[in-house]
Amino acid sequence: MNLSKYQNESVIRRLLNESKTIAVYGASNKIWRTSHSISKFLLEVGYEMIPVNPNYDEVLGVKCFPTLSDIETQIDIVDVFRHPSEVITIAEEAVQIGAKAIWFQEGVINEAAAEIASSGGLDVIMDRCILKEYNFHIN
């Protein structure tokens, strides 16, 4: 699989600069989880971070939603921290809610999910860390 079409530097830079609201799918209260530290980082640098995880009522003091469909706010980026085998339904849901982009974190590689999102009009980033990319492009 050629990941380069899902790692376009100008798209990454535009998403990081123009986005305001990021739904973190797989957000966690477990401080050792990457999704926890990145959720915290997103809040600290000024994004509206919306956690998505059916196992929590809140993450980092922010109301947590069981699914993307439960969120009433317009989502700019859906940042995905789930096993690649679980992301097709997340991509479908991201399209259904009208998200602008889906960002599959490092190691989350599923071309079928990326194609679903892309065909649905979303920008797609895959196998890149949003925190590292922010530090590279913005900081």
What name fits each language-model region?
Residues 1-75, 82, 87-139:
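Structural/interface elements that position substrates and couple domains in central-metabolism enzymes
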